[in-house]
Design a protein with these regions (language model features):
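N-terminal alpha/beta PP-like core and its mobile active-site loop of ThDP/TPP-dependent enzymes
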Residues: 2-169
Length: 169
């Protein structure tokens, strides 16, 4: 399957899973890497999408929504330094036990660490301040969707877990 078609298919599946978990808000900082996910979120009628050009503002806006609703908000951004801008809100969410689902649209592995700010290794960038992390690199859709569901449950605080931020990369 062509990469673009594969990205669109994955994005629709991930967003459908998010919608089934009754997550109703997404704060999106648009960019080329997250276009398939942005499109899938916008098409999902049960999710209200709010666009932010500044990633830091997006993360704090989403944190406020999550605090108000006691439900995770999706924070979607592109790759590289854009992901670093989310860290202050993630730390606050972690210590306030507020659910957030951070989705970062990473570059393919072969393009990482090539000397550009958009190519940093972002897999463990939030590791000290999240409840769970999943680096989506697998091709088995059923297996990966189950893992995504488990990560979302960690954010919500299901199964006697403390709610808080999680990261899907």
């Amino acid at each position: 399957m062509e990469t673009n078609t594969l990205n669109i298919s994955w994005s629709k599946s991930i967003v459908n899973l998010i919608a089934k978990k009754n997550i109703n808000y997404a704060c999106i900082s648009p960019g080329s890497r997250n276009t398939p996910l942005t499109h899938a979120l916008i098409k999902q009628k049960s999710i209200k999408c709010i666009s932010h050009i500044d990633e830091r503002s997006s993360a704090f806006f989403g944190l406020g929504i999550s605090k108000k609703t006691n439900s995770p908000t999706i924070i979607l951004t592109t790759s590289g330094t854009a992901t670093a801008n989310l860290l202050p809100a993630i730390i606050e969410a972690y210590y306030s036990m507020t659910p957030l689902i951070i989705i970062t649209a990473d570059r393919p592995k072969r393009l990482l660490n090539t000397g550009e700010n958009q190519t940093i290794d972002q897999t463990n960038i939030y590791s000290s301040y999240i409840r769970g992390m999943l680096d989506i690199k697998e091709s088995n859709k059923i297996s990966i969707l189950k893992k995504i569901e488990n990560i979302i449950d960690l954010s919500i605080g299901n199964h006697n877990n403390i709610p808080g931020p999680v990261h899907l990369n």
